[in-house]
A protein has these predicted regions:
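Catalytic cores of alpha/beta
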Residues: 114-115, 138
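Short, well-ordered secondary-structure micro-motifs
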Residues: 16, 41-42, 137-140, 163-164, ...
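Hydrophobic alpha-helical positions that pack around
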Residues: 2-109, 115-122, 130
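Immediate flanking context of iron-sulfur cluster ligation sites
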Residues: 118-127, 167-181
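Short acidic beta-strand-loop surface patches of small beta-rich interaction domains
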Residues: 8, 124-143
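Ferredoxin-type iron-sulfur electron-transfer modules in oxidoreductases and energy-metabolism complexes
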Residues: 154-176, 184-202
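Eukaryotic mixed-charge, acidic/polar low-complexity intrinsically disordered regions
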Residues: 136-156
Length: 202
C-alpha cells in the first residue's frame, strides 16, 4: 500500500536522484542519521512508520516488509526470469583502492582484492560481511556467495582480529573485570532507547 525508502543523510547525490522518481508515487523518502545502527530493521521500521516491532519479532508482525536495494533488484530480475549470478561486494580496509564491485558469484577474495589494487599490508585477516555480524577468514581462495556483503582487510595484529580469536569465556571474563556498572552501554543502546528491555550492563 505504501513504501518508505530509507537512506542516510550523507548520500546527498543518491537522495536527489531518487527523489525525482518518488515525488509522484506512494513512496516516501525517510532520511536517516549518519550513524550505526540506523540501518537496523527495528530502527528502520520505527523511523519510517513509528511502529515498534514486538521484542523477538519481525517487521511483518507490524505489517511491514524490510528489504535492501539489492534484494529488490534481484526480485525484479527473478520476475523476468533472470537468475542471481552476480553480487555487489564492497572492499575496504587495508586496500589501495577501496571500492564496490559487481562480481560473479564464485569470484575469489584474492581476485577482488586485486581489483581493489591489492593490499597495503602483507599479513592480514579478512572480515567477511561486516565486523559485528560477519566472520573472520584468512583464506583468500574463499569465494563470494549470495550472502557475501563485503570484505574488510585488516592487519593480523589489529585489535579486532585478536578479539575475534578469543574464546567466549575469555571475552566474558574481560568484560566483567572491566565493567564498573556505569550503565552507559544501556543508556545509549539503540534498542533500549526505543523502549525495549535491553540492558547490556546487567
Amino acid at each position: 500500500k505504501k513504501g518508505v525508502f530509507g537512506i542516510k543523510d550523507k548520500n546527498h547525490l543518491a537522495i536527489e536522484a531518487i527523489q525525482k522518481f518518488t515525488d509522484e508515487t506512494n513512496i516516501d523518502m525517510c532520511i536517516l542519521g549518519d550513524f550505526y545502527p540506523s540501518g537496523d530493521e527495528y530502527e528502520l521500521v520505527y523511523a519510517g512508520t513509528k511502529r515498534l516491532i514486538p521484542p523477538h519479532g519481525i517487521p511483518l508482525d507490524v505489517g511491514c516488509l524490510v528489504n535492501n536495494v539489492e534484494t529488490f533488484y534481484n526480485v525484479h530480475n527473478a520476475s523476468i526470469g533472470k537468475p542471481v549470478t552476480q553480487k555487489f561486494v564492497c572492499v575496504t580496509g587495508m586496500v589501495k583502492e577501496p571500492k564496490s564491485f559487481f562480481v560473479p558469484i564464485g569470484t575469489s577474495f584474492k581476485e577482488i582484492i586485486e581489483f581493489a589494487g591489492g593490499t597495503t599490508t602483507s599479513d592480514y585477516g579478512i572480515f567477511v560481511s561486516g565486523i559485528l555480524m560477519g566472520k573472520l577468514s584468512f583464506d583468500t581462495s574463499e569465494v563470494v556467495t549470495k550472502t557475501t556483503a563485503g570484505i574488510i582487510i585488516l592487519p593480523k595484529d589489529h585489535y579486532l582480529i585478536s578479539r575475534m580469536n578469543r574464546e567466549i569465556k575469555d571475552m566474558n571474563r574481560i568484560g566483567k573485570s572491566a565493567c564498573d556498572q556505569c550503565s552507559y552501554c544501556t543508556e545509549f543502546c539503540p534498542r533500549y532507547l526505543l523502549g525495549y528491555d535491553v540492558q547490556p550492563h546487567k
